[in-house]
């Protein structure tokens, strides 16, 4: 059992990239770092004001994940003080809940000496999230493509792609449950085939570093964009502006409400500045894909 303090660093993520709905994730260069030290009772201290509304006791998602992960293996963990530093916008489509879950799994693994395999961690995180896209990328880094059911899990990983990323963050957060409530219960067989083809071609294009084709396919999503785009002010205008400045493609980041824009490498700062000026009610953040996933430092 771990007694001395340690830290866990986990990247932000974006999910779907359009038609890769619920199975494609990409780690991003924004990060959450959690320092864990023994304490008499569980206490979470957030250093970022945006997280001030979150619970700081055992009801916190990170603590719940730690306890549930340990309990799966009939282990209990001693209380900790968790000091959290994060530059990941909360509830804005950048996998903040998946980051918390990934961190909790890693902390439980360390505190209870569970010696979990990568697949163990991926299965636990995906079960807790209900889908595999964000949490696999948070745990492994790079880009992940997952097949996940109650009985089976398969994950392929790709290195972080050589692109720049711009995230357009709106001023209002959107709960994932609300966003999922906008989706239809069914698609026709013909629609499903079209969506699957777009996702397959996009993934193949990314694997071949063909981001021109990948960007086009990002914008061919039929699974969620048509139903969720109504919640984004100036959605079509932003997409047109992205094309004007040479972006590969633009789509909704995860369940929203942020937008993910793939751009040629080393242009993300310039594109972010242009979009920030043109759409001031959004915050344009320049970043890159992240190679590394969750990491423990002693």
Model-derived features with residue positions:
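Anionic-ligand binding region
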Residues: 144, 148-154, 173-204, 214
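Short beta-strand segments
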Residues: 9-11, 27, 138-141, 147, ...
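Glycine-rich, charge-dense phosphate/pyrophosphate-binding loop(s)
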Residues: 206-298
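Gly/Ser-rich oxyanion-binding loop with an adjacent helix/lid
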Residues: 76-152
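ATP-binding N-lobe of GHMP and related small-molecule kinases
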Residues: 1-92, 106, 110, 114-116, ...
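Short beta-strand-to-loop capping motifs
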Residues: 38, 170, 261-265
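Glycine-rich beta-alpha junction loops
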Residues: 30, 142, 169-174, 221-222, ...
């Amino acid at each position: 059992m771990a007694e001395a303090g340690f830290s866990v660093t986990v990247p932000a993520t974006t999910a779907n990239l359009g038609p890769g709905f619920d199975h494609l994730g990409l780690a991003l260069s924004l990060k959450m770092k959690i320092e864990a030290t023994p304490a008499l009772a569980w206490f979470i201290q957030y250093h970022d004001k945006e997280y001030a509304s979150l619970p700081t006791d055992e009801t916190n998602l990170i603590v719940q994940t730690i306890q549930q992960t340990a309990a799966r293996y009939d282990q209990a963990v001693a209380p900790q003080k968790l000091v959290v530093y994060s530059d990941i916008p909360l509830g804005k489509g950048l996998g903040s809940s998946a980051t918390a879950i990934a961190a909790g799994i890693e902390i439980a693994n360390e505190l209870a000496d569970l010696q979990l395999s990568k697949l163990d961690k991926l299965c636990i995180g995906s079960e807790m999230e209900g889908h595999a896209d964000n949490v696999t990328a948070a745990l492994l880094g790079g880009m992940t493509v997952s097949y996940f059911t109650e009985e089976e899990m398969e994950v392929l990983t790709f290195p972080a792609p050589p692109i720049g990323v711009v995230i357009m963050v709106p001023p209002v957060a959107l709960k994932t449950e609300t966003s999922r409530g906008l989706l239809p219960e069914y698609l026709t067989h013909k629609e499903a085939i079209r969506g699957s083809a777009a996702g397959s071609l996009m993934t193949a294009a990314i694997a071949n570093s063909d981001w021109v084709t990948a960007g086009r396919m990002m914008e061919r999503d039929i699974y969620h964009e048509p139903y969720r785009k109504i919640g984004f002010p100036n959605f079509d205008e932003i997409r047109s502006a992205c094309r004007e400045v040479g972006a590969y493609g633009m789509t909704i980041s995860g369940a929203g409400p942020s937008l993910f824009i793939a751009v040629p490498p080393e242009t993300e700062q310039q594109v972010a500045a242009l979009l920030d000026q043109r759409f001031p009610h959004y915050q344009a953040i320049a970043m890159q894909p992240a190679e590394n996933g969750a990491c423990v430092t002693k």
